[in-house]
Amino acid sequence: DGYYYPSSGQAASVAECLLMEAKRLGIVIHTDSPVTQVKNKNNEFIAVTSQGEHFESRVLIIAAGSLAGMKEGKLTDPQDFCRTLGLKVQPTVPALTALVQEKDTIGKIWSGVRVQAAVALISDGKCMSKDKGEVQLTDYGISGIPVFQVSRYASYSLLKKKKTEAVIDFMPSMTKNELLEELRVRAGFTDRSAQGQLCGLWNSKLVHALCKKARIAIDRPMRLADCDNLAALAKEYRITITKTNPISQSQVCAGGVDLREIDPSTMECVNVPGLYLTGEVLDVDGICGGYNLHWAWATGTIAGKAAANKIGKQRKNR
């Protein structure tokens, strides 16, 4: 599908490779010393840690990511450092995360089901994004990669207090008419209950949920009239989204420092010389598949080289 992951299937493999290379290069890493404060005094940056340490430099790279995936209240939001230094920051919201639906008894029925489906994110009646793949149905809403891909739009829609909905197509491989014809053929087996007639078409728990929503008795045969309702529902199953999972359960955040604040050729701040920003601190977020990691590494490489060059020039001019 064009996405890149370690063949080990473990994200930790990537981190281990980076740590081994850092060790080889003699890079000193301070652990258990989260930065709590950043100051810019007379063109000198000062980073203060929770251990009371003070690190001073004429060059500072903020590569602290975001609060995504972090336990709430454990770390200082990296965006606060940027605001303190006078940078414009766009509101940060959860992205690549699950969506929570309006309370509905259907969730208890379909919880745990994985299904190939298409998902469209609707904000005040307008389709903002859509994707398809394996959707995970939960007792609280929907999850899975297709849901993650559209979740940033849900976050911003909710932030602006717009009506936010997800429309699910539970049979993306068929048109509505093709599905309707399939259902009519199955309805012809009048000696079976609806559960039996629909056996093999969807997961049995999803069949139960769809029939309940369409007001079809699961223990009785479907009628031809039921087929129209079920086809329409299965192709456009609409749920109201009330919130996303919190930032602590999100893979990344959308939002961050306005890109107009930096020179993209060096990642240096236009109005704060010597300050460099990389990765998720900036107002850039991508879909699943390694894009956010690539952005972090690419901008980190650019910023690292530019910062090193700047330090080299400063030393020569002394």
Predicted regions and their residues:
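A conserved FAD-binding loop/helix module that cradles the flavin
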Residues: 66-81, 85, 284-313
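Glycine-rich loop(s) and the adjacent beta-strand/alpha-helix scaffold that form part
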Residues: 59-105
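Feature captures the FAD/FMN-dependent oxidoreductase FAD-binding
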Residues: 1-59, 207, 211
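Short hydrophobic core segments
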Residues: 35-36, 54-71, 82-83, 135-140, ...
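An anion/pyrophosphate-binding glycine-rich loop and adjacent beta-alpha core
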Residues: 88-93, 98-221
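Flavin (FAD/FMN) cofactor-binding core of flavoprotein oxidoreductases
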Residues: 7-15, 23, 95-103, 244-261
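A glycine-rich dinucleotide-binding beta-alpha-beta segment and adjacent secondary-structure elements
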Residues: 31, 207-285
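Short loop/edge segments at beta-strand edges and connector loops
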Residues: 29-33, 91-93, 245
